[in-house]
Amino acid sequence: MDQKKTVRPFSMKDKIGYTLGDLGCCFTEQYRAMYLSIFYTLILQVNPFHVGILLLVTKIWDAVNDPIIGAIVDSRKATKGGKFIPWIRAFSFPMAVLCILGFVNVGNINYGLRLAYMFVTYVLYEALYTCVNVPFGTLSSVMTDDVSQRTALSRYRSLGGTIFMTVMVMIGPLFLYVDNQPVAGRFLMLACICAMLGLLCLQITCVWCKERVEVPERPQGEKLNYLHVLKEISHNKALLGVMFFSLTGMIGASVVNGLNTYLYKDFFGNVKIQAVSGMLSVLYAVLSFAITQPLANKFGKKEWCCMGAGFAAIVFGILFFFPVHNPVAFIVINGICYLGASGMQVLIWAMVNDAIDYHELQTGERNEGIVYSTYSFFRKLASAISGSLSNFVLGAIGYNVTAGAVQTAGVVNAIWKSYTGVYFLGYGIAVAILFFVYPLTKQKTAEMLTELKARRAAKESK
């Protein structure tokens, strides 16, 4: 891999390119996460229980698919274009097309055919997204092996999602709804815009991000023993900690996001108020981006995540018993909690890279693709559970999906209890897992990286 020797040094261009890559993924994946269930229930008039089952089944299959793709990526030798970038470049095109097809209004066809169309477009999109996201997530581990640069990449990656969520929370409710009712054609129009912008961002990532860390290639004829690697991964406490921490935290955050529109539409009585939250979230996002790395450097990634997310969990535990009916007051409280919990979202990718290093420390092999895709499996599992759970919650509380329906007082109160209760449990359990399972404190991370550098230097000197 001699071409690696002439690659330019790590720079701001890499950080911006990686930000754009995450933004590109979010343009399709997060748009779907925010509005596809709403599109299914309110536009296609599909029973929330049926939507929940569909999402659960397809997401579990998609999660199983992640380690398979990771193993395929690991088994392929690097080409002139790199090991991971060619995957992103090629599969981002069909992924964009499938994102658009998911928002085609098929509400007038037979109910069974409607479900079949939803299933096919959902499964195909997620398969293509995996072929983009697994190589993209692994890419940061070969862009640099410097700990501060990796933390910066994790921070800049989170910025991509933050930019998307900030803009979409402001634009979505204002554009997609007229007189508090969803408009089918606007969902498709926004899907087209998101798909094209996402494709553009990912193609820029392929040009601006460079692979620098030499990945040892397997000897000729030696095959990757997938089951052996999985057995080794099962002893990786760092990966186990970050997987289960992310699993529970993501379930909490995703269910809350899934109920967000219903909270503003039915509990507060005006879905457009959600746009105010989006505008204020710009300030919170800027503050989070500014403070997270200094706080992580001072206290450690694990330590700051526990403190911030723990604070947010306690606040929402109190809100469960004491509802806030003033939307402005709620938005402010929610924003303060976001600052606390944001460390978990910003630093998670740096912690995954640390888990890859921990795997190398234990086994002498990196296997970035499988390690990352195993983590991605748990993220997809969390997405499956949370995406289904928000729909199951709506079905369980008796939410009426009929166009223009007014929800009963009991349903409206249940939306609040579900929103705050899931937030408290999700983040509370996540903090406990991180504290008791994840071993890499600030000191232990520094010791691990020192040991790995010494080992690599010894290998190069032979």
Predicted regions and their residues:
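Membrane-embedded alpha-helical bundles of multi-pass transporters/translocases
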Residues: 2-462
